[in-house]
């Protein structure tokens, strides 16, 4: 098992791909790349089932190609992180994934998909405030201490047309990372979404200088590049992270500028993110990606282009035993209040003070939120074809009605990563609500209730089959010590989130 407490001790992996295990099919992707003389130096895979990751390591990815791991569902941005049992189970699962892939690190978005009981399909970025940075720093160190020697890379999230808080993005990540053994994942597209909110004028050179002057460069271990969309008809640049989309020229140019001009002494890997993209497009883009890396990055370039002395603010501590106490205690109640402000802004249209908000949160509400409820995790009429057919006989616009209902439901799932599960149970609750309020009545009511329960049960069964990854030690006498053992660290005052009602399913 790899032990890595310092990014400088991590292996230099080179130029690779970050992808999903299931689409595009990993074996087809690697075979096609090999036929085009484009074999990656390493393969990063997203969270899946342990058995599938093990199969990929042993039978799909050639033994000479290292694998790394892109985590999910470990929302260290959550004030309740230390106390929520789901995160202990997820940490145990992540360690199993790190074991079977042999990854020296786990990269994980600094974001959430559940905030104060509201469930989201898309990443919700943190509020850029010092109190939030302290919580993330504390929880990140806590998670890092449980990764059995592997390094945690905190990845900058995408900012969906807005950001909130008084810190700049770079200042925020400095406050999280400085004087810690944590690494950073720099996603160029995600960073562009933040840059366009902070800076009035864009050029690749200005973007690279912004990265150089504001981010903790010595913590950057991995760089990602993925698909990016630009919304039309907006008053300011509105960039949208979407790995299915092509990589636009502005993103290639920005990536090139960062590699060419920013001193990155801890950079060990650069990866093109290709999950959910068609293989012919991946072949073309990976060729371009490799050409840029070969031209603009040398793993030893920091010897020629070191950080200026006054820029060396991101020193990485070589051992967790040397960590100094936090300068200020993490204030959970303050962060919870900011979470409620974030929700009021995103979902209810509340307008915070201008100095607190960049961009336009209304764009999120109008262009993302409604679509993600109906589409993300599965198009609702595809998931519940018989149910939606029956409901549409009584409700003129099922989409609007369901989105409105979902918007009013406040919960946090017992496993706060599974949006499909939450959406499935919300659909059943929505139909029950329609029956209770007499929008559907008589024999039709009995029929639609039976139908939605049957379809929901099938979805949850299929989801457990495809995504279920129970701990193999859970059935041992005494259970699993990792899943059941509480996190230890500075005490937080958050209460565990309540379970999502199962409704008898």
Identify the residue ranges that each predicted region occupies.
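Acidic-and-aromatic substrate-binding clefts and catalytic sites of carbohydrate-active enzymes
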Residues: 20-28, 42-58, 75-89, 160-167, ...
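Acidic (Asp/Glu)-rich catalytic clusters
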Residues: 5-7, 30-38, 51-69, 89-104, ...
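Acidic/histidine-rich catalytic cores of soluble enzymes
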Residues: 145-234
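Gly/Pro-rich active-site loop or hairpin
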Residues: 80-84, 123-133, 194-266
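Boundary/entry segment of secreted carbohydrate-active catalytic domains
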Residues: 2-47
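Long, compositionally biased intrinsically disordered regulatory segments in eukaryotic proteins
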Residues: 302-505
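Active-site acidic/histidine proton-transfer and metal-coordination neighborhood
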Residues: 86-183
